[in-house]
């Protein structure tokens, strides 16, 4: 396609009547406007957009027509103004956010997109290891697998990660208890539950949960004796 003055407006390829392969467009002043790829009419892969003055405007990737991964937006003077992460079209977070903002975002995402919430929590744990929100995030991941997804083996894995990564935290005690509880009351693996409860008593002899753990062990021993 061309503008009335003969300047190129669009350069595209089609397959079966749909945009396919590389695509480029220009402003009327001759500056590049956008460049990327289509696959059977859908934006796919890396795309770049420019302001009319030639400065970068937006840069990122599409997956099946949805913004995906890291996207960077620029002001007309060329300065970066926002770096964001997307997951299949859903905005996850701004890369400039700290752990508190990210944790709040993960809590909100939990209500509508659990997998995306877990991605944000992973980012907190990996990027802000010394923050209290890293501990909270790892524990919340375990809670999501336990209560929302009902994936009990994954919940055990995530609770154990709390114990390993944040051994002195209050959440570590709660996590070791939950590992024991899942084995005993959900998966009915009483032998492993007994082992985990004993591990709890060894690691946390002064915990507020000691009485509850001793009671659980007593009940486990009783059930195992009757079997």
Predicted regions located by residue number:
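Glycine/tyrosine- and acidic-biased, solvent-exposed loop/turn segments at the edges of beta-strands
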Residues: 1-132, 146, 160
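Short solvent-exposed coil/turn linkers within tandem alpha-helical repeat scaffolds
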Residues: 17, 41, 65, 125-134, ...
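Terminal, low-structured helical/coil segments at or just beyond the last alpha-helical repeat
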Residues: 99, 108, 188, 194-227
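Specific register positions within alpha-helical solenoid repeats of the TPR/Sel1-like families, i.e.
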Residues: 110-111, 143-146, 180-184, 222
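TPR-repeat structural position
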Residues: 114-115, 152, 190
């Amino acid at each position: 396609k061309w503008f009335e003055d003969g300047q190129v407006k669009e350069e595209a390829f089609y397959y079966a009547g749909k945009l396919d392969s590389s695509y480029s467009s220009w402003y009327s002043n001759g500056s590049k406007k956008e460049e990327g790829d289509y696959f059977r009419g859908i934006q796919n892969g890396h795309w770049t957009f420019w302001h009319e003055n030639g400065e970068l405007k937006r840069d990122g990737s599409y997956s099946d027509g949805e913004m995906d991964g890291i996207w960077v937006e620029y002001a007309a003077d060329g300065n970066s103004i926002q770096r964001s992460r997307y997951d299949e079209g859903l905005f996850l977070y701004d890369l400039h956010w700290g752990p508190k903002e990210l944790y709040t975002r993960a809590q909100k995402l939990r209500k509508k997109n659990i997998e995306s919430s877990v991605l944000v929590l992973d980012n907190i744990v990996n990027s802000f290891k010394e923050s209290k929100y890293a501990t909270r995030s790892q524990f919340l991941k375990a809670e999501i697998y336990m209560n929302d997804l009902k994936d009990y083996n994954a919940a055990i894995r995530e609770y154990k990660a709390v114990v390993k990564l944040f051994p002195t935290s209050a959440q570590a005690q709660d996590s070791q208890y939950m590992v024991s509880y899942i084995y005993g009351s959900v998966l009915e693996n009483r032998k492993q539950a007994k082992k985990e409860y004993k591990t709890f008593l060894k690691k946390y002899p002064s915990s507020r949960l000691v009485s509850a753990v001793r009671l659980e062990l007593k009940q486990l021993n009783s059930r195992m004796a009757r079997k």
